[in-house]
C-alpha cells in the first residue's frame, strides 16, 4: 500500500515537472518569436515579458521611433492575445477608453441603453504617450488597471483575462504633458528604458524592414498558456537568500537608518508593493531563462526597473548631479 502511494506521488511530481517544463518552453518560444521581429532590444523584450508573466503592467520610456508600438503588436501576436492601441491626447475622455452607454430604440418602439465597450477591453493594451492625457483620463485607465474592471453608469464590466497595459512616455517633450503622480506610477510593475539599437542591430533593421518581405511574428502561446505560466510563476520556490536580498534592497531605498549614508539623498522611497513586484519579477525572469528558482543575480538585474519610478531624490542630491540609477547602483553594490 505504501509503495503504491509512493509511486502515485512520484507520478504526480513527474506530471508537475513536465507541465512546468512545457510552460517554460512556451515562454522561451514566445521570447524567440518576439526577438525575431524586434532587433537590438533584447533587454526591453525580456523585461516586457517578465512584466506580463508577473501579471503586471509596464511603463516604456523612450524617444519616438524605437519600435515601442511594434513591440506591443508583436507581443500580442506571439502571446496569442487580443491587442489594442490608444493614442493619448489632451482631449481624450475617460469614455473614449472605458466605453459608453448609448440609447437604442427597437423596431417596436422600446428604448434601452446598450453598453459599447472601449479599447480598454483588450488583453494587451498599448497606452501611447499616456502623459499627454488629462489627469482625469489617466486616472480612469489606472483605476481599471488596478481593479481589473470598469464601472459605467453604475454597471460593472469585468475586463478580459489576462489584462495587461504597456504604456509609453517620451522623455524629451514635456510641453503639454501631465506627469503621472507617484501613487499612479506605483501601479506599474516596471519602468523600462527603451534605448537606441547598436550598430549591427540597426543594420539588420534596415535590411529587414525596407525589403519586399518584412519578418512577421508567429503565435507561440495562447491566452490560456499565458495564464498557466502566470500561475506557475507564483508557485516557483524562492530561496531565503533571494528574499533577504529583496528586503535589504527595497528597505535601503527608503530614507532612514537602513539606507545609511545614502539615506540623505532619498526624499521618498518604495513601499511594500515594490517588494511584491520584485518577488514576482525574479521568479518570472528565472522561468524565462528555463530555471525553476530565482537567484540573487535576478534581484540585481531587475532592481532598477522595479524601483526607479518608486523613489525620488532630495533637491540637494539632484543639485549635486546624483541620479536615481546611480543611487540604486550603490544600493545593489551592497548586496552583490
Task: Report the location of each language-model feature.
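Conserved C-terminal "switch" segment of AAA+ ATPases
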Residues: 16-24, 37, 177, 191-262, ...
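Pre-Walker A (pre-P-loop) alpha-helix and adjacent loop at the N terminus of AAA/AAA+ ATPase modules
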Residues: 19-63
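Conserved alpha-helical scaffold flanking the Walker A/P-loop in AAA+ ATPase domains
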Residues: 47-50, 104-126
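Walker A/P-loop
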Residues: 49-90, 103
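P-loop (Walker A) phosphate-binding loop of NTP-binding proteins
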Residues: 63, 97, 168
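Walker B catalytic acidic pair
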Residues: 128-129, 140
Amino acid at each position: 500500500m505504501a509503495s503504491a502511494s509512493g509511486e502515485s506521488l512520484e507520478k504526480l511530481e513527474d506530471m508537475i515537472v513536465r507541465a512546468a517544463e512545457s510552460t517554460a518552453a512556451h515562454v522561451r518560444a514566445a521570447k524567440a518569436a518576439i526577438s525575431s521581429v524586434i532587433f537590438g532590444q533584447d533587454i526591453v523584450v525580456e523585461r516586457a515579458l517578465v512584466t506580463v508573466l508577473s501579471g503586471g503592467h509596464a511603463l516604456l520610456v523612450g524617444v519616438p521611433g524605437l519600435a515601442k508600438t511594434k513591440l506591443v503588436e508583436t507581443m500580442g501576436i506571439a502571446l496569442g492575445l487580443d491587442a489594442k492601441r490608444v493614442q493619448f491626447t489632451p482631449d481624450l475622455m475617460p469614455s473614449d477608453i472605458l466605453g459608453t452607454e448609448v440609447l437604442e430604440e427597437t423596431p417596436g418602439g422600446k428604448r434601452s441603453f446598450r453598453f459599447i465597450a472601449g479599447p480598454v477591453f483588450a488583453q494587451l493594451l498599448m497606452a501611447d504617450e499616456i502623459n499627454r492625457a488629462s489627469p482625469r483620463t489617466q486616472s480612469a485607465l489606472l483605476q481599471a488597471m488596478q481593479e481589473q474592471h470598469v464601472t459605467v453608469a453604475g454597471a460593472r464590466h469585468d475586463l478580459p483575462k489576462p489584462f495587461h497595459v504597456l504604456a509609453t512616455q517620451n522623455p524629451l517633450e514635456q510641453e503639454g504633458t501631465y506627469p503621472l503622480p507617484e501613487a499612479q506610477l506605483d501601479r506599474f510593475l516596471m519602468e523600462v528604458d527603451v534605448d537606441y539599437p547598436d550598430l549591427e542591430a540597426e543594420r539588420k533593421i534596415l535590411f529587414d524592414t525596407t525589403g519586399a518581405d518584412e519578418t512577421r511574428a508567429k503565435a507561440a502561446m495562447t491566452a490560456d498558456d499565458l495564464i498557466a505560466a502566470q500561475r506557475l510563476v507564483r508557485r516557483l520556490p524562492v530561496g531565503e537568500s533571494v528574499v533577504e536580498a529583496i528586503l535589504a534592497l527595497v528597505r535601503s531605498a527608503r530614507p532612514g537608518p537602513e539606507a545609511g549614508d545614502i539615506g540623505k539623498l532619498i526624499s521618498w522611497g518604495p513601499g511594500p508593493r515594490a517588494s511584491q513586484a520584485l518577488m514576482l519579477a525574479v521568479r518570472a525572469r528565472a522561468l524565462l531563462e528555463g530555471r525553476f528558482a530565482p537567484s540573487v543575480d535576478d534581484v540585481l538585474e531587475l532592481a532598477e526597473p522595479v524601483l526607479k519610478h518608486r523613489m525620488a531624490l532630495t533637491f540637494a542630491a539632484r543639485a549635486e548631479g546624483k541620479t536615481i540609477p546611480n543611487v540604486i547602483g550603490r544600493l545593489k553594490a551592497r548586496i552583490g
